[in-house]
Amino acid sequence: MYPPAPDQSADFLKVFDEERQRIKAWRKNRGVPEDDGDGRLDLIGLAFSGGGIRSATFNLGVLQALAKLEILRYVDYLSTVSGGGYIGGWLTGMIHRLAGGMKDVEEGLDPSQVNQNNLPQKAIAHLRAYSNYLTPKVSALSADTWSLFSIWSRNTLLNLVTLVAGIAALILFGRFVGLTSMVTKWTAGFGWPLAAFGFAAVTLALTLKERLPRRFCKDSGVQQLVVLPALAGAILMTFHVHAHPIQDWVPGGMALSVLFLVLQLVAGFWGWFLHHHEQKMAAVLGGLLQLGVAAVSGFVTIWLFYAVSCGVQHYAGKPFAPWLVLTVGPPAMLAAVSLGVVLNVGLMGRDIPDSNREWLGRLGAWAMIYGTGWLLFFSVAFLGPLALKAGWSAFAAWAKATVTLAWVGATIGSLMAAKGAKTSGEQNGGTMNRVAVAGPWVFLLGFVSLIGLGVHELTLGPVKAAPPAASASASATAQLTQSGWTMTAIFDSQGGPAKVAVTPWDRYWGEMAVQIRSSLLWKNPYDQAGISISWYQGLLEVMLLAVAITLVMAWRVDINEFSLQHFYKNRLARCYLGASRKREDRHANPFTNFDQNDDFPLNHLDDPNFSGPFPIINATLNLSSGRNLAWQESKGASFIFTPVYSGYDTGRDASGTSTSRRMRVGGDADGAATPTGYYPTQLVAKTKYEPETGADAATALRFTNDGIMLGTTVAISGAAANPNQGYHTSTAVAFLMSVFDVRLGWWLGNPAGPKASSNGPIFGLGYTLAELFGTTSADSAFVNLSDGGHFENMGLYELVRRKCRYIIACDAEQDEELGFGGLSTVIRMCRTDFGAEINISLSQIARKPDNKPENFSGCHYAVGDITYADGTTGSLVYLKSSLTGNDEPADVLGYHSAVPQFPHESTADQWFDESQFESYRALGYHIADKALGDGRAPLSAAKTKQDFFGALKGCVDPPKQNS
C-alpha cells in the first residue's frame, strides 16, 4: 500500500499524476506494456452508466465479452455510476482477492471456458441467486421483506420525533411570546430603545461593511449581524405598541427613536461624503443633505410604525389579537423599515454610491424572505389548527374521509414522483412532475397544521380537567383578565366547556387564552374560586421540553446511521462484494445472513500488487445553494472516490470561470488556484466495522484509519432516492423526502475542510435542516453526497477530464424512447467544463420517428471522435442497451416479446427474476461482442491501439458535428 503524501490535500494535477503512477505499475502486473511508446500513456477508459441492477447485469455481460476478446486487461480506468458501480465493485473485489488478480478473473469470466468451478463463475452464480438483492426471499411473510419495513419505520419514527419536536418548539415559542404580551407590560420603558437599536443594525453594518471580517460579509454573516437583529427589533416594537396605548409611547419614545435613527443614518453616510467631497464646504453641504434626508425618511418610517400600531391597537381586546399581532406585526414592521430605506435611497439620488444601493437592495431581499417566512409559518401554525377544528366539526363524514384520503394520496403520490426516474424537476415535465411540484406543498401545509393542532390540544389538556367546585352550582365562571381585555370562559361541573352557543372561531381563541392559566406538569390550574394560580408556566415547560427533545435526538440519532443508506449498503455488499469472495471464506451471521468482511476499505486497492483497472466511483456533490452561480441549474458537481484520493474539483471558481479549462492545457500557475477538495482516501471517513464471526467480543467493534469502505462508496454512488439530488432538487420535495426518511445519501466530511477525516457530523441538526430545505453547499464542514447520476449518469465526465485516448461507454440507463439524454448531458458538460468536443452520430441506434416500443434500432453501438482542448484526439465507442430484432439470441427476443419494456424496464424494479437477469446479461454480452469482436483480431494482436480502435466503424454513419 502506498503511503499518503506528506501534504495531505491535493489539486487535480497532483491527483492525476498519482493515478498515472499506479496505472503504469498495474499495467505491468497485468502483463501489458507500461507505456505506449516514448513514455506516452494512451489511456483506455471503460464507463458503466447508472441504472440500478439493470445496468449492473447488462454490464456483467459486457465484462464477459471484454474478457473473451482480451480487451479487459488493457483497460486503465473503470469509471462507474450507480448500478454500474455494483458490478464495478464486484470486479475490483475479485481482482483484489484472487491471488492471480486480473489473469484469473479474465480467464474465469470468459464464458467459452469449460471450467465452471472457478471463482468468477461461482460469483456469477451468487449474483443470480441474489438478483433480488434488497429482499432475497420475496414473500409477504418473508423476514427479508419485513426487515425493509421494520428498518424504514424505525428510522422514520426516530427522525420524525426530532422534526416534530423542533417544529412544535417553534410553535410553542410563538404562543409563549403571544401570551407574554397579554399578561405583562414587560416592554415598558425598554421597547422603543431596544427596537431602535435592532433597526440601527442596518445602518451600523452599512457603515462598517468594508471593515468587517470576510465571513460576516457573506449572506450568512449579514443575516446574523443585520437581518436577525432587525427582526428582533420588529418583534419588540410590535409587542410594545400592542401592550401600550399609542398616547403612552408617542411623545418620549418617538423623540428618542427618531434621534437614535437619525444619528445612525448620518453616521452611515458621513464617511462616504468626507471621502468623496474633498472641499470642506462640499462636505458640510453633503452632511446637511444627509441629515435632512435622514430626518425626512426617519419621520416617514415613524409614521409607518404609527400606521401599523393603529392596526394593532384596533384589534386590542379581541380574543385573537395576540396571535394576529404575532403573525402580522413583525413582517409589517420590517416592511415599514424597508419603505423608509427606499425613501432614503430615493431622496439621496446620485449622491449615494451604487455599491450601497446594491447592498441595501440585497438586504431588502433578505428582509422580505424572513418576513414572508415568518408570516407563512405562524399563519399555518395558528390558523391551521383552527381550520382543522372548525372544518372537521362542519364536514360530513364522507367529506372528512375525502379530505383525509386526498391529503394522504397527495403525500404518497409526491413521494413516488419525487424518486421516480421520470421526475426531472422541469415545470412542464408531465403529470409526474406536476405531482412532484404541487404535492409536497399540500403535505407541508397539512403537516405543520397537524403539529399546530397537536400543540394546541396538548397545552389545552389541563383546561379540560375539572376545577374545584366553589359551590354546588352547575357551572363555574372563570374571569381571565389579560392586558386590558376580559374573556369569560364557562365550564360545567365536570370541567368541560358549558353547552352554550359559541362559534368554533370564538371557542378556539378562547382555548388559546385559557392556556395562559395552565400548568402541565404540576399544580391544579384553578383555585377554589375557579381562578388560575399558575399563569403560563406550563407553556414554558412544554416549550423547553420540546427544545430538549430536539437537541438530544439530533445529537443521538445520527444523520447517517439512521438513514436508509446502511440498509442499502449492507445488501449491496452481501450481493456483489460477497460474490467476490470464496464461499469457504464467508462466515455470515446465521440470523441476518450478513458477513461484515464482505466489505473492505477502498484504499486497500491502492496496492503495488493490484492488477485491475484504476476504479473511479462517481457520486454527486449536492450544491442546492452556494455562491457559485454556474451550478444553479445542475445543483451539483462531480465527486469521486478512488483508492488514492477522494473529493471534488468544481471546475469553476466563485465567478463562474472554468478553472478546469485553465488546467487542461498543461496546468500552469493560473490553474493552481482551482477550488478543489481532494483528500487521501486512506484518511477519508474513519470507518467502524466488525471482524469475522467468532472473534473476541471485546474487539467486536473497533475503529480503523483505513478510510471509507468500498461498499459505502458504491452505495453513495447509487443513492438515487435522496432529498437533495442534483438537477432534480426541489425544496418542497426535499422536505417531504426528509420527513419520511427517503434518504440514501451520505453526509461526509468536506475533503476541502478541517473535518475531512470525519465520517459524519456528531450533532446533525443543522445538516438535517439543510436536507429539509434543500440548502446543501460545499461551504460547510460536511457535504451531502448522492447518486452520481444526479450530476452525470454515463461515467464519462471524469474520463474526459483525464483525457483518455479511448473510451468504451456502456449505456444501460432507462431510455425507452432512445432520447440519449444521459449522453447529451455529458457531451454538453465536457464542452463547457473541459473544452472537449465529442462528435458522434446516433442515427442508427435511434428508433423510427414514431418511437414505438416495438420498433427496433438499426445498430447497438456507435463510434465517435473526441477532440480535447489541447488538440489531442481520441475515440468513443458507445454501447447502447438496445434491440435490433435480427441478431440477438432467441431467448433475449423471447423475453422482449413477453416484456415489451425490455431492455428499458423501470429503475424502480430492483427485484430481478432469473429470466430477467439472464436476458440483460446476455444482451450486454451480445452487444459488446458485436461491437468490439465480430470476427476482428483481438486488441493484443493489433500493432497499436489506434489500429484496433480505428477499425471500429461498424454499422454507424460517419461522425458529424453536433450543434
Predicted regions and their residues:
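Interfacial juxtamembrane loops and adjacent helix segments
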Residues: 24
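Patatin-like phospholipase A catalytic core
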Residues: 1-10, 18, 28-29, 34-963
